[in-house]
């Protein structure tokens, strides 16, 4: 009996070469449904429509095509099993040896933020995953292909084994198939969980669902944070960094991606690009080292913002990661070539900027559209031993109208503007975090110290004489008055912090004694 291949695909890429080779070189009978059968017939290949094979027409507008015992019996039957062979013969079922199925494009469909509930639901495949799982379960006898990228290697394996499909190949394909259907179901679950119609009820009923995310492999990385650690990058194809285009430069590393994420989060405080949900309000640039910003600035143009950000700490900026929140033009590109950098990310680059940056061949240049950011979701996920921690991103807009003046002296408008700028930055610095800023530029940043006054000392010393007349922001409350007193010694004129310490009055009293203004935000921004 000639072998049989069942082909039913949404993505027709590579379909004809695969079908022709199976039929013409290896003698496969071709069984197909719907649009796939039409493509094969138009190419002159002999194909049996599924409806003719089963004796049952497609019904419910195509919702039911392949859900039939003649299909699944042919896929699931164990060859050589007397009972199975008897059932096949009694029901006149033809064994199916190769199943080629890819699924309705659900993930691509829901990548459109405006997609309707009805259109999304109609792009949930039912028959396809059922056939894929049946074939994967019976991989001792059936090969299953779920992606056009598998076709060439499958045909190479067939040629190498004289037309037979080895057990090793079938097992590998079965693993791929189960991963494929798991990812598909996870995408459906995540989309439904994020729909406003299905947000958790007040009783918490929806929150007990498992947290699911199945992401395809984007690329294997050379190593992790250190050379002895293996690493890989998994990403949704068009969401977040999965939507980035690398325009030039060396391969991205684990540390590059971590630093890029930190730089992007920081620069988005000032808006990003055009056409997204949060367009740029003012040109801004950020320089990051080891996931901490070391220089941040706003200005009237991106070249000026870059100069000011780099001037914030040029020593630390060497070998850094830069994010720009708008189109990089030629002057900005020239500023970017003024010192060694690892990566730059921006929503767009002017052609003349690309020409200038091409002189730095190893510089990794990434273009990330605002639409990719909008498609990335709102979860912040970190791994712990044996599990995941999932929280909302800390990206709510600054709400300055809710701040209170705790000191006798209210900040001037210039001080208030600087305090707002510093407060936007401090939540992107590892705790304990202190930022010193003035005129839309960071002057000193203290990060990751085990006590707050230690971070303050680092930030103030880095600021040097620039601290005089500047402001200071803290991601957490002042547990004692030592930070305020140290700030005053360096010439700081105003401070901002969440408040909430049992000793708030000590710091407020110190501000009044020393002439500093203090704002309380009522919101903490720890970052671990």
UniProtKB/Swiss-Prot annotation:
The UniProt record lists the EC number as 2.1.2.3, 3.5.4.10
SUPFAM superfamilies referenced in this protein's UniProt entry, alphabetically: Cytidine deaminase-like, Methylglyoxal synthase-like
Q: Which reaction does it catalyse?
A: (6R)-10-formyltetrahydrofolate + 5-amino-1-(5-phospho-beta-D-ribosyl)imidazole-4-carboxamide = 5-formamido-1-(5-phospho-D-ribosyl)imidazole-4-carboxamide + (6S)-5,6,7,8-tetrahydrofolate; IMP + H2O = 5-formamido-1-(5-phospho-D-ribosyl)imidazole-4-carboxamide
Cite a GO CC annotation: cytosol
Q: Which family does the record assign? A: Belongs to the PurH family.
Under HAMAP family, the record lists:
PurH (MF_00139)
Name this polypeptide is given = Bifunctional purine biosynthesis protein PurH
Species of origin reads: Synechococcus sp. (strain WH7803)
């Amino acid at each position: 009996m000639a072998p049989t291949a069942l082909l039913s695909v949404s993505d027709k890429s590579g379909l004809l070469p695969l079908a022709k080779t199976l039929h013409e070189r290896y003698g496969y009978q071709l069984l197909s449904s719907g649009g796939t059968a039409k493509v094969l017939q138009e190419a002159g290949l002999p194909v049996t429509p599924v409806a003719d094979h089963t004796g049952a027409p497609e019904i419910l507008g195509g919702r039911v095509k392949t859900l039939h015992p003649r299909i699944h019996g042919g896929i699931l039957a164990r060859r050589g099993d007397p009972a199975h062979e008897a059932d096949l013969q009694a029901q006149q079922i033809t064994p199916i040896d190769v199943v080629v199925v890819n699924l309705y494009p659900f993930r691509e469909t829901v990548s459109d933020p405006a997609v309707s509930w009805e259109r999304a639901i109609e792009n949930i495949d039912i028959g396809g995953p059922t056939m894929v799982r049946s074939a994967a379960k019976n991989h001792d006898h059936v090969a299953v292909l779920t992606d056009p990228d598998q076709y060439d290697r499958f045909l190479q394996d067939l040629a190498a084994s004289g037309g037979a499909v080895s057990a090793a190949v079938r097992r590998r394909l079965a693993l791929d198939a189960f991963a494929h259907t798991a990812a598909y179901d996870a995408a459906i679950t995540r989309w439904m969980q994020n729909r406003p119609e299905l947000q958790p009820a007040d009783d918490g009923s929806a929150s007990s669902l498992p947290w699911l995310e199945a992401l395809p492999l984007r690329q294997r990385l050379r190593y992790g944070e250190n050379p002895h650690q293996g690493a890989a990058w998994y990403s949704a194809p068009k969401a977040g960094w999965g939507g980035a285009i690398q325009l030039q430069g060396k391969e991205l590393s684990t540390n590059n991606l971590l630093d890029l994420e930190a730089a992007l989060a920081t620069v988005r405080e000032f808006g990003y690009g055009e056409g997204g949900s949060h367009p740029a309000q003012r040109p801004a640039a950020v320089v990051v080292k080891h996931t901490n910003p070391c220089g941040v600035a706003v200005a009237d143009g991106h070249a000026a913002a870059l100069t000011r950000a780099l001037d914030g700490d040029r020593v630390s900026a060497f070998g850094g990661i830069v994010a720009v929140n708008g189109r990089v033009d030629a002057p900005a590109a020239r500023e970017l070539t003024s010192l060694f950098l690892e990566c730059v990310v921006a929503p767009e680059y002017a052609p003349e900027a690309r020409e200038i940056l091409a002189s730095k061949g190893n510089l990794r240049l990434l273009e990330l559209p605002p639409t990719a950011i909008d498609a990335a979701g709102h979860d912040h996920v970190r791994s712990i031993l044996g599990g995941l921690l999932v929280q909302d991103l800390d990206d709510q807009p600054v709400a300055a109208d809710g701040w209170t003046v705790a000191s006798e002296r209210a900040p001037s408008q210039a001080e208030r503007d600087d305090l707002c700028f510093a407060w936007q930055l401090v939540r992107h610095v590892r705790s304990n975090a202190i930022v010193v800023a003035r005129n839309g530029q960071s002057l000193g940043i203290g990060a990751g110290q085990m006590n707050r006054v230690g971070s303050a000392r680092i930030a103030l010393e880095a600021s040097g004489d620039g601290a005089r007349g500047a402001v200071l922001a803290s991601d957490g409350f002042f547990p004692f008055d030592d930070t305020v007193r140290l700030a005053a010694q360096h010439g700081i004129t105003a401070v901002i912090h969440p408040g909430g310490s049992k000793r708030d009055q000590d710091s407020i009293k110190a501000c009044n004694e020393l002439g500093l203004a203090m704002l309380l935000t009522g919101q903490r921004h720890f970052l671990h």
